[in-house]
Each structure stands twice: as C-alpha cells, then as structure tokens.
C-alpha cells in the first residue's frame, strides 16, 4: 500500500553543494564560483589590478577580486546593502545606489580601473519578460559606469538575464570593447536565464 502522506520535497543538491563549499571556503555566497570560472577562462583580473565590483553584497565577488589582484592591487565595491563579511585589507565596500550616484561615482570610488565586474540582479517578479527588462536596465547602468571609469584596455564582466533585450546589450558591449565573450559558468543553475557578457580591452 502506498504511503499517502506528504512526501518531503527533494533538496536542491546543486545549491546545497555550492552553498556548503562556499561556507567551507569562507565566502559569503556560492556566486563566487561563477567569478572563479570566468577568471579561469578569460583572466579578466590581473595581479596588481584595480577592480570595481558593482552590486557587491554580500561580498563574495569582492573578496575573490581582492584575492586575485593581490596586496599590490585593490578591490572596491558598491551596493545598496552593506557588506557585513570580513574583507581583505585591499578591499573596501561602499553603500549606495549606482543609479543615484552614477554622475558622481568616480568622485566616490576613483577612476582608471583595470576591471569592472557586475553580478547585479533585479528583484524578480516571476515574469520572465519583466525580469529580463529590469536586468537590462541594470546592465546598461553597469556598462555606462564601466565606460566612464575603466582605463583603456580594461575589462568588463556583467550578468544579464536572457530576454528580448539581450542582443541589444551584446551589441553595446561589442562596440565598446576590442572583443567580447558570452559565457555561462557551470556553477549557474542549468534552468537559470542568467548569462555573462565579458568585454575585453576597452577601446
């Protein structure tokens, strides 16, 4: 006779694996493994580089960027939410809204960065078209910041939700960088619409 009681929902083994791995390795979130894969493939952050992390909370990308650039470099982050995680000596996090601060962001965080990275994502609604449009708006803001604050030859990493605006944003990146790549890390959920656009060598 079958058990008609409630069955326990299956655990998300993917999330459990990366969440536990991040905890074991002292990172605030599993998203760090996406940056690790991007770095391994494209070497967007060099030793001694200066890196700006847009949407840096809870701090995993900022911490790893600081590790990659080393003590002779620096990693600067900005997010609406404060970063509570302990940061390396060469990393600092600012609290603020890049939309509100866009015209004065250079005064707050400096300029001539070697890399600008963005793992920003909008508050999701469950409507794929709306979520993709909101993601596109964040990406355009990130690209404007990157174009204003990157040194010539600098690199750009940006997460975007795939949708109707994806090709438009890809073309914007393509026009501003010597080369560009589209990449979905293995550590992303296979069902996720998120993907990364990497701009290499700001023109």
From Swiss-Prot:
Keywords: Cytoplasm, Methyltransferase, rRNA processing, S-adenosyl-L-methionine, Transferase. Its EC number is 2.1.1.166. One of its GO terms (cellular component) is cytoplasm. GO terms for molecular function: rRNA (uridine-2'-O-)-methyltransferase activity. It is found in: Cytoplasm. It catalyses: uridine(2552) in 23S rRNA + S-adenosyl-L-methionine = 2'-O-methyluridine(2552) in 23S rRNA + S-adenosyl-L-homocysteine + H(+). InterPro entries: RNA_methyltr_RlmE (IPR050082), RNA_MeTrfase_FtsJ_dom (IPR002877), rRNA-MeTfrase_E (IPR015507), SAM-dependent_MTases_sf (IPR029063). S-adenosyl-L-methionine binds at residues 59, 61, 79, 97, 119. The active site is at residue 159. Belongs to the class I-like SAM-binding methyltransferase superfamily. RNA methyltransferase RlmE family. Specifically methylates the uridine in position 2552 of 23S rRNA at the 2'-O position of the ribose in the fully assembled 50S ribosomal subunit. This is Ribosomal RNA large subunit methyltransferase E. It comes from Desulforapulum autotrophicum (strain ATCC 43914 / DSM 3382 / VKM B-1955 / HRM2). The lineage of its organism: Bacteria, Pseudomonadati, Thermodesulfobacteriota, Desulfobacteria, Desulfobacterales. The gene is rlmE.
């Amino acid at each position: 006779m079958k058990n008609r009681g409630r069955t326990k929902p299956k655990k998300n083994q993917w999330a459990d694996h990366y969440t536990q791995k991040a905890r074991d390795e002292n990172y605030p979130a599993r998203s760090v493994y996406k940056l690790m894969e991007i770095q391994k493939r494209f070497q967007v952050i060099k030793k001694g580089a200066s890196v700006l992390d847009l949407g840096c909370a809870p701090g995993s990308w900022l911490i790893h960027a600081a590790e990659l650039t080393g003590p002779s470099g620096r990693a600067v982050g900005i997010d609406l939410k404060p970063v509570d995680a302990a940061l390396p000596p060469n990393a600092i996090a600012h609290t603020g809204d890049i939309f509100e601060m866009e015209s004065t962001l250079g005064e707050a965080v400096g300029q001539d960065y070697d890399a600008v990275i963005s793992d920003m994502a909008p508050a999701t609604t469950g409507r794929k078209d709306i979520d993709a449009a909101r993601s596109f708006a964040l990406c355009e803001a990130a690209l404007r910041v990157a174009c204003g604050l990157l040194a010539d030859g600098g690199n750009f990493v940006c997460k975007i939700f795939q949708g109707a605006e994806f090709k438009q944003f890809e073309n914007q990146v393509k026009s501003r960088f010597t080369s560009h790549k589209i990449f979905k890390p293995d550590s992303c959920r296979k069902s996720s619409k998120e993907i990364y656009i990497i701009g290499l060598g700001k023109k």
